[in-house]
From Swiss-Prot:
Free-text tissue specificity from the UniProt record: Expressed in roots and rosette leaves.
Protein name stated in the entry: Anaerobic nitrite reductase AHB1
Residues covered by the Globin domain: 8-157
Stated role: Phytoglobin that reduces nitrite to nitric oxide (NO) under anoxic conditions (e.g. during flooding or in waterlogged soil). May not function as an oxygen storage or transport protein. Has an unusually high affinity for O(2) through an hexacoordinate heme iron because of a very low dissociation constant.
GO cellular component entries: cytosol; nucleus; plant-type cell wall; plasma membrane; plasmodesma
GO molecular function: heme binding; metal ion binding; oxidoreductase activity; oxygen binding
Reaction(s) catalysed (UniProt annotation): Fe(III)-heme b-[protein] + nitric oxide + H2O = Fe(II)-heme b-[protein] + nitrite + 2 H(+)
Amino acid sequence: MESEGKIVFTEEQEALVVKSWSVMKKNSAELGLKLFIKIFEIAPTTKKMFSFLRDSPIPAEQNPKLKPHAMSVFVMCCESAVQLRKTGKVTVRETTLKRLGASHSKYGVVDEHFEVAKYALLETIKEAVPEMWSPEMKVAWGQAYDHLVAAIKAEMNLSN
């Protein structure tokens, strides 16, 4: 939701996101890896989008380059969600957003890829905090993800 260019993220949504992220933060490397393994299980061809996985004989989950990448993606998604209400916008550095837009565009990321990643992210969070998970938490994380994706897509369109 947006109001005059500012994202509306309720206090309740913020509380759900902050509470769950505070529990997940310490395991962000493992959770990031789980997120990417889920993405690859749902859409195996996405592995080819990563140069370090494309021709590697090593299984993705054992690839030494995947874990740090996966962790940085997971942390960025979560930190962006936590800041959403406070700032009223996606708070990823502009240079990072530009880079994300350019790389997602270059590797042919389309709407379906973002949808797979959203599903995988929500499932990863649900499994990480099962005792906290609720329909409201799913909506909160889903909205936060959608705002991040909208910001990345805006940069993708600029880089085309």
